[in-house]
Amino acid sequence: MAWYDEAVFYHIYPLGLAGAPKQNYYGEPVHRLNTLLPWVNHIKEIGGSALYIGPLFESVGHGYETTDYKKLDSRLGTNEDLTAFVAYCHEQGIKVIFDGVFNHTGRDFFAFKDIQANRENSQYKDWYCNVNFWGNNEYNDGFSYDNWGGYNLLVKLNQKNPAVVDYICNVIRFWVSEFDVDGIRLDAADVLDFDFMKALRRTANEVKPDFWLMGEVIHGDYSRWVNGETLHSVTNYTLHKALYSGHNDHNYFEIAHTVRRLQNMGTLKLYNFVDNHDVERIYTKLTNKAHFAPVHVLLYTLPGVPSIYYGSEFGIEGRKEYGSDDSLRPALNIEDYKDSVKTNPCTALIAALGKVRQAVPALSYGSYDELMLTNRQFAYARDLDGTRVIVSVNNDDAPAGMHLATGNCTAYIGALSGEKVSVQDGHINITQPANSGEIWVPEGTDLNVKPVKAQSVNVENTNSINTNIEASSVDTEKATDMVVEDTQSETTKAEDTKAAAPKAETAKTASENTASETTAKESESESTPNATASDDPADPSTITMDWSKSPESMTVPELQAAVLAKLAGNGPVDAQMKKTVVDNIWHDSLVNWLKSFR
C-alpha cells in the first residue's frame, strides 16, 4: 500500500488559477505561485490529500511547450517559490505531483535553438524526430520535423535517443532534489515510447519511495501502460465519459458496463475524474444539474483514485468556446469561496465525500461487487477484510426503493445523511431520494463526518441556480435542491477547432489558445473532426483492411477500421463506441490504441 492508493487528488492549472498572462516574454519573475498557498488549506478542508499541479516550468504560452524544464515559469515566480510551495503542501499533509511534458518541447528549448543556429552541425539534431534539412515549415526554419497533434509549436522529442532519455531522467532527479516532488503526471503518455516510459519508471523507483507515475492516456487497454515496469496509473477517460453520459441518458448500464470492462483489465488503480483542464466542466456537461450529487458519489466510491479539478467543487461552469480552453482554466480568488463548505451544497458534498473516502479503507482497497442495476438505480459493494460498504445512487426525479445484500453486521449508517437502517435477512431496504447517492457503512464505523448543513448557495457562473436556497437536510439532496428546476438540454457549441497554420511570429502568442495542446484530447468532443489530422474523410466501415500493414503505415481511416474490428472481436460495438473511434483522428493515438489489443 502506498500513499497514492488512498489519495484524494485536487488538480490545479496554475497559470490559469493565478491569472498569469497568456504569453511569456521571459521578463522578471512575478510571484503569482505564492497566491495559491491559501488553496492548499482549502484542499485539506475538503478532504484532499494530494495535489496535481501543472504545467509549471518555463514556456512561451500555455505551459505545454516547454522552454526550460529546470526553471519555474517566470509568470509564476522563482524556483525558491516552488520549493517553498511544495514544502508548505507537505506540512499540511498534501502530496504533490508535477506535470511532466516529455513528449515534446517548445521551439525556445535550448536543443531546438541549437538546431536552428547550427543546422546539420548541431549536436542536438538527433534530439527530435525526423529532422529533415531538405524540408521547411510555416516558421521558415529551413527544415521540418515531427510534432504533436499537427502543431509545429510542439516539437516531438526523439525518445529512442539515449541522450534524450538521460536528460529527461535527470530532470526527474532534479525535480526531486530541488523541489521534493512526490510524482509526475506524464503528458501525452499514449504517444510516448514504451522503452522511454520504462526508463522513467526505473528512475522513479530510484529517486524516492512510492514516487508515482501517472500517464495521460485517452484510449486503449490501460493495462498496457499500467504495470510493474511502466506506469502506476493512467487517466480514466473511459469512466469520465460514462459518468456524465450515463446520467444525461438515464443509463446506469453504461456506467456499470464501463466498470466491468475496466475490472477485466486487472487490478488497476486508475486516475478517475469528471473534468480537467482539457474537457468541459461537469456542471456544464450535465443536462440535469441535480445529477451533480450522484455523479460525485460514484467518482469517490468506484475503484480508482478520485480527483477534483479546481473550482468544480463550487459548481462553476466551463465550456469550450471557439476552440479555446480559456474558460476551462479561469483565475479564481479563494476569498470568494472561503465559506463554501458551509454555504455551498456542492462544496459541502465534496468535502463530506473526501472525508468519508479517507475514513473508509474499503473505498480505496475493497473489491467491487455489483448489487443492483437498472437504467435509473445502481448499487454496488466494496468489500474489504470481511467488511462490506454499500454505495447506492438514483438518477431519477422520484425516490426509489432498493433491496441490497449486506455484510455481517446488524445495521448500516448512511455516511452522508446519518440515516440508520437495520439489516433484515442479510439485506437492507432503503429509499434512495431523487437524484442522490449514499454510502452505507456498518454501524460503529468511525467516520468523524457530520451531515452537511449548508445554509445558502452562492455559486459563480451558474445563472440557472437559485442562489437564495435554505438547505437543511441530507447533503446529496441539498446539492440537488439548488438545481432541481434546471433541466435544460446541454447546448455545447460545435465550433470548428481547426487551427490555421500559425505565422512565424504570431504562433508564439499563448500557443496559442491552448487549442494547440488540447483540442484533440477531449475524446468526447461534439465538434466534427476536420482535416487537421487527416485529409482522408473515408468512412472506416467502408475500408478493406490489409492486415499485413504495420499500424504505423496505416492511414487514419485504416486505423479506425482496424480498431473497430478489434473491438467487434470482443463483443458488440454500439453507436457510442463507434463514435469514440471515429472522433479520434490522431494517428499516433490510434496506433497505440490498435497495439493495445492483445
Sequence positions of predicted segments:
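Substrate-binding/active-site clefts of carbohydrate-active enzymes
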Residues: M1-F9, Y13-S49, L56-E178, L200-E206, ...
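Carbohydrate-interacting/catalytic domains
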Residues: M1-Y52, E58, Y88, F314, ...
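Conserved, mostly hydrophobic/aromatic
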Residues: I12, I43, I53, Y69, ...
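Active-site clefts of carbohydrate-active enzymes
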Residues: G266-T287
